[in-house]
UniProtKB/Swiss-Prot annotation:
GO terms for biological process: proteasome-mediated ubiquitin-dependent protein catabolic process. It is found in: Cytoplasm; Nucleus. It comes from Arabidopsis thaliana. Component of the 20S core complex of the 26S proteasome. The 26S proteasome is composed of a core protease (CP), known as the 20S proteasome, capped at one or both ends by the 19S regulatory particle (RP/PA700). The 20S proteasome core is composed of 28 subunits that are arranged in four stacked rings, resulting in a barrel-shaped structure. The two end rings are each formed by seven alpha subunits, and the two central rings are each formed by seven beta subunits. The catalytic chamber with the active sites is on the inside of the barrel. Disulfide bonds: none annotated. Non-catalytic component of the proteasome, a multicatalytic proteinase complex which is characterized by its ability to cleave peptides with Arg, Phe, Tyr, Leu, and Glu adjacent to the leaving group at neutral or slightly basic pH. The proteasome has an ATP-dependent proteolytic activity. Keywords: Cytoplasm, Nucleus, Proteasome. This is Proteasome subunit beta type-3-B. One of its GO terms (cellular component) is nucleus. Pfam families: Proteasome. Belongs to the peptidase T1B family. InterPro entries: Ntn_hydrolases_N, Proteasome_beta_3, Proteasome_bsu_CS, Proteasome_sua/b, Proteasome_suB-type.
Length: 204
């Protein structure tokens, strides 16, 4: 078993019309044993920028603390929030810096940039970025997430339709992966508001 599969995870981000959604499962396990059912994989950097981290749970928490620290330094120096593209480059640089002993996680970054244009990207554990204009996935359920998202995604969805689409994709995918699941955690971000919702899924 790969170390990336040790704790199990499923993270997906999807683009809508001037909005985006990012969702994850809530299970923290040690291989097939469930440890917690309310694990937080998605974290807010600021109101228009979120990061989801799949992979080894210890590295997820360590990397998140380092990213919050770097973003606060940026805010103090620049007196503004970081743009999503800048933040993605920062994450990539931090991961690549540790390439010989990498953080064992795969980030999914989603944010609203200039003119409220949504930005999503993912990268591997050493910071190789993969940009997308529709959706990005990571985690142990990524194979089934790709299939569900390709079947359900359509461009320029409004916020409510986007929430419904990403939720259905996530729930149907984690049912096909025994290392992730136990409900879902969804953020839908528009220029005016952030909606956070908890999904109830199969509890096994």
């Amino acid at each position: 078993m790969s170390i990336f599969e040790y704790n199990g995870s499923a993270v997906v981000a999807m683009v809508g019309k001037n909005c985006f959604a990012i969702a994850s499962d809530r299970r923290l396990g040690v291989q097939l044993q469930t440890i917690a059912t309310d694990f937080q994989r998605i974290s807010k950097i600021h109101d228009h920028l979120f990061i989801g981290l799949s992979g080894l749970a210890t590295d997820v928490q360590t990397l998140y603390q380092r990213l919050v620290f770097r973003h606060k330094l940026y805010q103090l120096r620049e007196e503004r929030d970081m743009k999503p593209e800048t933040f993605a480059s920062l994450v990539s640089a931090i991961l690549y810096e540790k390439r010989f002993g990498p953080f064992l996680c795969q980030p999914v970054i989603a944010g609203l940039g200039d003119d409220n244009k949504p930005f999503i990207c993912t990268m591997d554990s050493i910071g190789a970025k993969e940009l997308a204009k529709d959706f990005v996935v990571s985690g142990t359920a990524s194979e089934s997430l790709y299939g569900a998202c390709e079947a359900m995604f359509k461009p320029d969805m409004e916020a409510e339709e986007l929430f419904e689409t990403i939720s259905q994709a996530l729930l149907s995918s984690v049912d096909r992966d025994c290392l992730s699941g136990w409900g879902g955690h969804v953020y839908v971000v528009t220029p005016k508001e952030v909606k956070e919702r908890i999904l109830k899924g199969r509890m096994d």
